């Protein structure tokens, strides 16, 4: 684990809002040199705190109007890896988690329509032999969406 100080925290807060913020702009705002910002960012990259930068896509603008969560109960605990490999091949599955509680695996699935969601469930997910049952929860809204504060 890499210990971070208040300057690192400030840098991370800025970069999580806009990863394209120039180092010179941050340096001016924080009262340090651009070189200091560069060194700090590189140290956080090397330690794995900063994994990379990415484009954030608005799924709705691409027509993905249905977001749902699917709880999966497996027939056997030995089937986790096999099921995950199969789920990885479905483009609609955008996140998967191993969980405690009622479900073995919890998925986030994005589709264009309810009909497409039905198809994904009926012709893909529910045909996986190692799955005992599923429960689908359709998201109405996403009122809180944020990164953790460094």
Swiss-Prot record:
It comes from the Bacteria. SUPFAM superfamilies: Dimeric alpha+beta barrel (SSF54909), Winged helix' DNA-binding domain (SSF46785). Keywords: Activator, DNA-binding, Transcription, Transcription regulation. Residues 23-42 bind DNA. The keyword Transcription regulation applies. Residues 4-65 form the HTH asnC-type domain. GO terms for molecular function: sequence-specific DNA binding. The keyword Heme does not apply. Pfam families: AsnC_trans_reg, HTH_AsnC-type. Signal peptide: none annotated. PANTHER family: REGULATORY PROTEIN ASNC, TRANSCRIPTIONAL REGULATOR, ASNC FAMILY. Activator of asnA transcription. This is Regulatory protein AsnC. It comes from Haemophilus influenzae (strain ATCC 51907 / DSM 11121 / KW20 / Rd).
């Amino acid at each position: 684990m890499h210990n971070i100080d208040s300057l690192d925290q400030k840098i991370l807060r800025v970069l999580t809002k806009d990863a394209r913020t120039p180092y010179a702009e941050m340096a001016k705002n924080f009262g340090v040199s651009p070189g200091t910002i560069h060194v700090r960012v590189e140290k956080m990259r090397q330690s794995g705190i900063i994994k990379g930068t990415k484009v954030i896509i608005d799924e709705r603008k691409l027509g993905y109007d249905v977001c749902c969560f699917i709880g999966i109960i497996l027939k056997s605990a030995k089937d986790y890896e096999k099921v995950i490999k199969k789920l990885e091949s479905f483009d609609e599955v955008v996140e998967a988690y191993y969980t405690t509680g009622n479900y073995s695996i919890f998925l986030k699935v994005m589709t264009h329509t309810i009909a497409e969601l039905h198809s994904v469930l009926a012709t893909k997910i529910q045909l996986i032999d190692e799955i005992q049952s599923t429960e689908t929860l359709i998201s109405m809204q996403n009122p809180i969406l944020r990164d953790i504060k460094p």
